[in-house]
Amino acid sequence: MRVIGLMSGTSYDAIDAAAADLGLAGDRLVLKPLGLMSEAYDSGLREELAAALPPAATSLAGVCRLDTRIGQAFAAAAVRADRELCGGRAELVASHGQTVYHWAEAGRVYGTLQLGQPAWIAEATGLPVVADFRPRDIAAGGQGAPLVSLVDLLWLRGRAGTSVALNLGGIANLTAPDGTAFDTGPACALIDAAAHGLSGGRLDHDVDGALAARGTVHEPMLRRLLAEPYYALPAPKTTGKELFHLGYLRDALAGFGTLTAEDVIATLTRLTALTVADAVRAVRATEVVASGGGTRNPVLMEMLARELGAVALRTSDELGLPSAAKEAYAFAVLGFLTVHGLAGTDPVSTGARHPSVLGSVTPGRDGLRLPPRADWSPVRLVLE
């Protein structure tokens, strides 16, 4: 089955589309990558989205407009991916949408909201669309994240030692072989917020880690940041830009006088490296396989490698899965599992009471024709 996975992460800079030919073969799920592409949000939509994200206030009218506009942007990306990556022969779209809010209190998640109305995708492509993946796990008592953990478990199963998957997006999350999975804290969220806020909006992120490379870590600020209570919470746990946003950063800077943008970003980059390395040590990993936009920041990767010491650090590209679109591939897998009636969660990873078949399905132009329910769940993901 040719599936297009669509994903826009907490950095909300672009829509990643990854196409894969997926099939079950015995106890294996075989994934043949067909290609990937990225479609940047237009500046107006990105600004509208940024203005609506926590801690800012928004309106129901604003949410409705964003749901439609993001859905139309995802639809355009899906049409292009079908044409350029699948030769017009895609059979399913799996859309994560754009997370705008994750409702968590006292370690429990009560709700989550991803925008990007899937009806626009179904209308534009004519294909069935699986979307709204996270709420089913939350209803079962889980965190609704990290959902890529099941894919990580299937993919890294059988590797020597203790291999953990690490995603460095806006938020960092990891998955260990025993199913333990959680958000470690910010990966690029605070770095991006600082780059944007301290450059007067000229920059969206620290390009190639250039600002961090010119800066010096401000130890008092780092100590204040490391005192954040989230880091001490037990797994499973999840977080997002509801906590780690520009206002949070401004509070952290209070009382330190004027710091250069370079020093602030160097400090935030070190914060990510330290908190990720602490999480890796907590699960006694011997290897870290990293993916996500943060892998393109050489300063962050160098700091992280230094903190990890003897623990090997490599990117998912080295194992055959492009780090730039690993999450999009993961949601293609989750969509495939859903239409085959298979669970897309591991309760150990999310804290749910039981595994769940994820998402809601929007029929395509020819109605809803699902494949036969699979008789068993795969235990390994194999790349071809």
From Swiss-Prot:
Residues bound to ATP: 9-16
Coiled coil regions, renumbered to chain: none
SUPFAM superfamilies assigned: Actin-like ATPase domain
Any single GO BP term: peptidoglycan turnover
The protein's enzyme class: transferase
Keyword Transferase: yes
Recorded metabolic or biological pathway in which this protein acts: Amino-sugar metabolism; 1,6-anhydro-N-acetylmuramate degradation; Cell wall biogenesis; peptidoglycan recycling
Keywords for this protein: ATP-binding, Carbohydrate metabolism, Kinase, Nucleotide-binding, Transferase
InterPro entries linked to this entry: Anhydro_N_Ac-Mur_kinase, ATPase_NBD
Top-rank lineage group of the source organism: Bacteria
Catalytic activity: 1,6-anhydro-N-acetyl-beta-muramate + ATP + H2O = N-acetyl-D-muramate 6-phosphate + ADP + H(+)
A GO term, aspect molecular function: phosphotransferase activity, alcohol group as acceptor
EC number: 2.7.1.170
Function per UniProt: Catalyzes the specific phosphorylation of 1,6-anhydro-N-acetylmuramic acid (anhMurNAc) with the simultaneous cleavage of the 1,6-anhydro ring, generating MurNAc-6-P. Is required for the utilization of anhMurNAc either imported from the medium or derived from its own cell wall murein, and thus plays a role in cell wall recycling.
Family the entry assigns: Belongs to the anhydro-N-acetylmuramic acid kinase family.
NCBIfam families in alphabetical order: PRK09585.2-6
Name recorded for this polypeptide: Anhydro-N-acetylmuramic acid kinase
Organism: Streptomyces avermitilis (strain ATCC 31267 / DSM 46492 / JCM 5070 / NBRC 14893 / NCIMB 12804 / NRRL 8165 / MA-4680)
Gene: anmK
